[in-house]
Amino acid sequence: GVLGTVKNLLIGAGKSAAQSVLKTLSCKLSNDC
């Protein structure tokens, strides 16, 4: 259904956003940007 599709899109967007935040944090913490 539509709700399931929207939910999957939000989950996918959240995962990719979280991954980029984690990458930024780890590179700043290790001074390896």
Swiss-Prot record:
GO terms for biological process: defense response to Gram-negative bacterium; defense response to Gram-positive bacterium; killing of cells of another organism. The keyword Hydrolase does not apply. Expressed by the skin glands. Belongs to the frog skin active peptide (FSAP) family. Brevinin subfamily. Antimicrobial peptide active against the Gram-positive bacterium S.aureus (MIC=25 uM) and against the Gram-negative bacteria E.coli (MIC=6 uM). Has no antifungal activity against C.albicans. Shows hemolytic activity against human erythrocytes only at high concentrations (LC(50)=180 uM). Keywords: Antibiotic, Antimicrobial, Secreted. GO terms for cellular component: extracellular region. This is Brevinin-2GRb. It is found in: Secreted. InterPro entries: Antimicrobial_frog_2 (IPR012521).
